[in-house]
Curated annotation (Swiss-Prot):
Transmembrane segments: none annotated. SUPFAM superfamilies: Glyceraldehyde-3-phosphate dehydrogenase-like, C-terminal domain, NAD(P)-binding Rossmann-fold domains. This is N-acetyl-gamma-glutamyl-phosphate reductase. The keyword Amino-acid biosynthesis applies. CDD domains: AGPR_1_C, AGPR_1_N.
Amino acid sequence: MIRVGIIGATGYTGLELVRLLKNHPEAKITYLSSRTYAGKKLEEVFPSTLENSILSEFDPEKVSKNCDVLFTALPAGASYDLVRELKGVKIIDLGADFRFDDPGVYREWYGKELSGYENIKRVYGLPELHREEIKNAQVVGNPGCYPTSVILALAPALKRNLVDPETILVDAKSGVSGAGRKEKVDYLFSEVNESLRPYNVAKHRHVPEMEQELEKISGKKVNVVFTPHLVPMTRGILSTIYVKTDKSLEEIHEAYLEFYRNEPFVHVLPMGIYPSTKWCYGSNHVFIGMQMEERTNTLILMSAIDNLVKGASGQAVQNMNIMFGLDETKGLEFTPIYP
């Protein structure tokens, strides 16, 4: 059994980790941490978890003694210093602290200096692209939700040099859970219900993460213009991506089928079928569709994921499976909830 700890167990991604790991045949939750609810049983605060473990303040000695792997489900900037205190424990960070190759990029977009970053061996945890590196990783930076949906949608086209990477336009829409459990007027029911609005236009922190990984795939400079929108639903991300090409839709579609042929969670839809967030609700599955706007030679890619599962906690469990030599679908085999 893999002994598992979770820091930030009472946020949305932390609670999703609890749900997934309680049903994992090879994992046992041995440590749960929450500053807000320290001293309480998790099921006292969230009865749906059916988990009677007592929440505690972060204690690096207890983590090192009781855990083989630690999931850190904390806001950006909160995990880095905690992780540096730990020895002999594998780390999967669901925040942004270990996603970037260049600490200067993190400093520019997140406003924090990561002292000693270059001494930490870390891997960007997108299994479909970095599976071999993840196998031997000690620290994994779990990808962001928007980058997961965008990178997986673009990877085959960029890898095969089928599109122009110079300007990639991304219009993405996310459910409110993507904002976390923080108290903010913008996320009150009356503010969100029956409303659709863009946010962080031209300055979203996920842009450099997308560009970093897409440039690795293409070997060329990539420019992403990204506009996210908040929609009145709980879960899900739908990303619509516009990119120039001189290839046919049939050639591109065939390349996608080949690229993802052996991937258990990525599904390339038949031409003319477009994804819905309802199809991946509560699951680790990704659905990708495409169409060609022939007047302008524009390829339109569409991807749907559950932001809390493949966009966060499910992908983290997938990474854990790979790190410990398990079938990466362990604990994630379930189909989406529908309707």
